Amino acid sequence: MEITFLGTSSAVHSYTRNHPGIILKAFGEVMLFDCGESTQRQLIYAKISPMKISKIFISHYHGDHILGLPGLLQSLNFRGREKPLTIYGPKGLKKVENAIYSLGYCKFDFPIEFIEISSGTILETDEYIIKSQEVMHNVTNLAYSIEEKKKP
């Protein structure tokens, strides 16, 4: 497992930190956790291709955690992405999906699935389990855990 912190700042940018975004490279996949507005630039600095991202997990809908998502999706489309992308988030993700599509310039030529989730196991493969848990914040907020399954 390789974890890259793209941003760890709060809602206000600073000279040295960017809005939240974390990349997990594991199990032959690249997963993004939160997508602050500087995510694309930070991916370039980290030499991580956004085209390799297979899943995006959003913790909550404050702007510093999600405002990079519309631009990232548009850039993936401009770059000719074809493979599906799955986006997970707490209740309210369908409103985010509708907002992205209503921006006027958004038409995507690759499949995007928006999945609203709550606490519990949200994804299980032969190699790993991803769980979410609601945590204290002033809005619905999910924390995520990734558990690697034991190999026989």
What are these regions (language model features)?
Residues 1-152:
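Binuclear metal-dependent hydrolase catalytic cores
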